[in-house]
Amino acid sequence: MVPEPGPTANSTPAWGAGPPSAPGGSGWVAAALCVVIALTAAANSLLIALICTQPALRNTSNFFLVSLFTSDLMVGLVVMPPAMLNALYGRWVLARGLCLLWTAFDVMCCSASILNLCLISLDRYLLILSPLRYKLRMTPLRALALVLGAWSLAALASFLPLLLGWHELGHARPPVPGQCRLLASLPFVLVASGLTFFLPSGAICFTYCRILLAARKQAVQVASLTTGMASQASETLQVPRTPRPGVESADSRRLATKHSRKALKASLTLGILLGMFFVTWLPFFVANIVQAVCDCISPGLFDVLTWLGYCNSTMNPIIYPLFMRDFKRALGRFLPCPRCPRERQASLASPSLRTSHSGPRPGLSLQQVLPLPLPPDSDSDSDAGSGGSSGLRLTAQLLLPGEATQDPPLPTRAAAAVNFFNIDPAEPELRPHPLGIPTN
């Protein structure tokens, strides 16, 4: 972030001989800030350890999350504790030489967190809109280059201008004695805010809006394909039965409702992510520009807006993994939980639950989402516990060869509509399975 600047090494404020007494009633504020600091450090440390220790989470997409959690961890360990003392005592109570260093780390860590959020949105954008070419575009070396570029930009926007005094160019106001606040000039604030917030936030809005439109479009495609294939299968079997005109329409409505709910969930997810980002950071950057123009923001209000931006580093390790099913499973294996072993044994003992017709599940492949004929080597599912699979195989055997070749190919990105936050980047080689080809 670009905090309200503080004194440089050339300034000579009247630093206090020792820490002053904290104002009355600050005990509750100190307790709340300590909880925020502890939660930020613990949550980010836990998720970094989770990704490093769980092989299922070691992929290119999660590399950006490690960078995000690292920047947020630095905010919790390096930036928040001095900021808490600064807010409680109303002045800088640490060593004088640490003021400029802390200010530079404040700018760098918060800017790196915002830039990492931008990289995550770009990674999601490439993974959803072109999953088959994702591995060719987002290689580990390119991901490393993007992360290093984000950290380099954050460092250049913090240490270099502050050490060289660029933030004071054209600024006539002297620093307040004993304060550690960055009193930057308007040109510096505009350039730094544009590079570290406004441009990344524009990219985040663009990519997430494109993802939302693609998710809605693909949800409609999957619903129409599933409905059409179900009706084709019922016509091909041609089993004599009493006609029930309301059954097909009810099934179609159920499928359409299910996929509409998935699209709605995607919309809510993006709304939460974008809303959290802008609610925490936009007020601070607006106040930062206003402060550089008119110097009319009180220190207390500016501290509140600054801590609101800090809270983004607290919520990132909670919100982002909350919508990723692989993180939930890995967290259940990583943390000691008395119920987890029994649940895993129960799931392993009843494989028929995973092959039943329970509807499409997020994170599955296209063959598992749509009622496609199974490959010939899946004979293990032909027992009594998987009657749905044998019924699909019978449907495929009854199709005529001429009819099978006339089916249009499935869109290769249809599986992405199931849950665009749980796509596995390790399996981008998704090939459409031709409908109606006999498996024998």
Curated annotation (Swiss-Prot):
Alphabetized GO MF terms: G protein-coupled serotonin receptor activity; histamine receptor activity; neurotransmitter receptor activity; serotonin receptor activity
Top-rank taxon, per record: Eukaryota
Residues annotated as binding serotonin: D106, N288
Coiled-coil parts of chain: none
Topology Cytoplasmic: residue spans: 53-62, 123-142, 210-266, 324-440
GO CC annotations, alphabetized: cilium; dendrite; plasma membrane; synapse
Outcome when changing Y310A: Decreased G-protein coupled receptor activity in response to serotonin
Keyword tRNA processing recorded: no
Name this polypeptide is given: 5-hydroxytryptamine receptor 6
